[in-house]
A protein has these predicted regions:
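Transmembrane helix-loop-helix
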Residues: 36-40, 46, 82-122, 209-252
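Acidic (Asp/Glu-rich) catalytic motifs at the cytosolic membrane interface
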Residues: 45-67, 176-197
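Interhelical loop and helix-boundary elements at the membrane-water interface
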Residues: 2-18, 58-79, 114-141, 193-195, ...
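Loop-to-helix transition at the N-terminal end of transmembrane alpha-helices
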Residues: 37-50, 69-74
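Core segments of transmembrane alpha-helices
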Residues: 19-24, 80-86, 138-150, 206-217, ...
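Hydrophobic alpha-helical transmembrane segments of membrane proteins
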Residues: 9-18, 24-26, 39, 43, ...
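Functional transmembrane core segments of multi-pass inner-membrane proteins
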Residues: 132, 136-180, 186
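Helix-coil boundary and interhelical linker segments in multi-pass alpha-helical membrane proteins
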Residues: 21-44, 86-101, 145-168, 218-227, ...
C-alpha cells in the first residue's frame, strides 16, 4: 500500500481526525462565548476523544483478536493508552464542576460501548448504542457536554439563556453532522437501531437536517455571533447532507464531513485577524 495512504488510513482509523474536530469546536465555543481558551481543556478534549472513540470502536475487536493484532491496530492501541494517560493527568487541572462534566461523559461513553450485565427493563443486557433510536442523540449529548459544557464549567461560568441556546445549537449541529454517517450506514445498520434515515427515509432526513441547519444559523444570528464562519460552515454541511447517499465512499463522511468543525475553527480564527 502507498505510504501516504497508510498514514491517511491511520489518521482516520486512530480517531485523530475526529479528535481535532472536537478540539476545534471547543475552541469555537471559547471564542464565541468569550471564555478563556485554556490549553489544558483543549488538550483534554483532544486526548479523551481519541481514548473514547478508539475504546468504542476497538474494544470488542481487541478482545476477540488479541493474539492477531494488525500492525496498525497495535499502534492505535498504544496511541489510545498514551492519550488515556494524558487525559487522566489533565483532569487534575480542571475545576470541580468541569471534572463532573468529564465524569458524566465518561460514564455515558462506557455504557455506549459495554453491554450492561443485568437485564434492566430499559437496556435488557445491551449497550446504549443498541437501544432503538438513541444512538445519534447520545453522540449529540456527549459532544455538547465536551465541547460546550466543559469549557463553560472550567471557566466557572453560570448558565443563562445565552448558554442554554448555545448548547442547544451545538446539540442540533452535531445531530445534523451525524446524518451523512447514518445515511452512509443505511445498508448495513440493523433495522432495530431505528436510525433517522431508517425512520424518515432519505428525502425527509435531508429536509429535517436542513431545518436543523436553519436553527443553528438562526441561533448564531440571534446571539450576535460572527456570521460568516457559521453561515459558511453550515452551507457546506447542507451541501454535504444533500450530496449524501448510501453509496458515498467511507472517506466522504469520515474525512470531509468530519472536517467541517475545523472549517468553522479556521474561518472564525481568520475573522479575528
Amino acid at each position: 500500500m502507498n505510504p501516504l495512504k497508510k498514514i491517511f488510513q491511520f489518521y482516520i482509523n486512530s480517531s485523530i481526525h475526529v479528535a481535532l474536530a472536537a478540539t476545534a469546536l471547543t475552541w469555537v465555543t471559547a471564542e464565541e462565548l468569550q471564555l478563556e481558551s485554556k490549553s489544558n481543556v483543549l488538550g483534554l478534549v483532544f486526548c479523551s476523544t481519541i481514548s473514547a472513540y478508539n475504546f468504542i470502536k476497538y474494544f470488542g475487536l481487541a478482545q476477540i483478536h488479541h493474539r492477531n493484532y494488525t500492525s496498525q491496530l497495535k499502534w492505535i492501541i498504544w496511541l489510545s493508552i498514551v492519550a488515556t494517560a494524558f487525559s487522566i493527568w489533565l483532569c487534575f487541572s480542571l475545576a470541580q464542576s468541569a471534572l463532573f462534566v468529564m465524569l458524566v461523559s465518561g460514564i455515558i461513553c462506557f455504557l455506549y460501548a459495554i453491554p450492561i450485565g443485568f437485564r434492566h427493563q430499559f437496556l435488557r443486557g445491551r449497550n446504549l448504542r443498541a437501544v432503538s433510536g438513541l444512538k445519534i442523540f447520545i453522540i449529540g449529548l456527549v459532544w455538547t457536554l465536551i465541547t460546550v459544557g466543559l469549557p463553560l464549567m472550567d471557566n466557572l461560568t453560570s448558565f443563562g439563556t445565552t448558554e442554554f441556546l448555545y448548547g442547544l445549537q451545538r446539540f442540533v449541529f452535531i445531530l445534523v453532522l451525524m446524518l451523512p454517517f447514518d445515511i452512509r450506514d443505511t445498508a448495513y445498520d440493523e433495522l432495530k437501531l431505528a436510525t433517522i434515515p431508517q425512520i424518515l427515509g432519505l428525502f425527509w432526513t435531508k429536509i429535517a437536517g436542513a431545518v436543523g441547519i436553519g436553527f443553528v444559523v438562526w441561533v448564531s444570528f440571534s446571539l450576535q455571533m460572527q456570521r460568516l464562519p457559521v453561515l459558511t460552515t453550515n452551507l457546506l454541511l447542507l451541501a454535504a447532507l444533500l450530496y449524501s447517499n448510501p453509496r458515498r465512499s467511507f472517506n466522504f463522511s469520515a474525512f470531509w464531513v468530519e472536517a467541517l468543525p475545523m472549517v468553522w475553527f479556521v474561518l472564525l480564527g481568520l475573522s479575528q485577524i
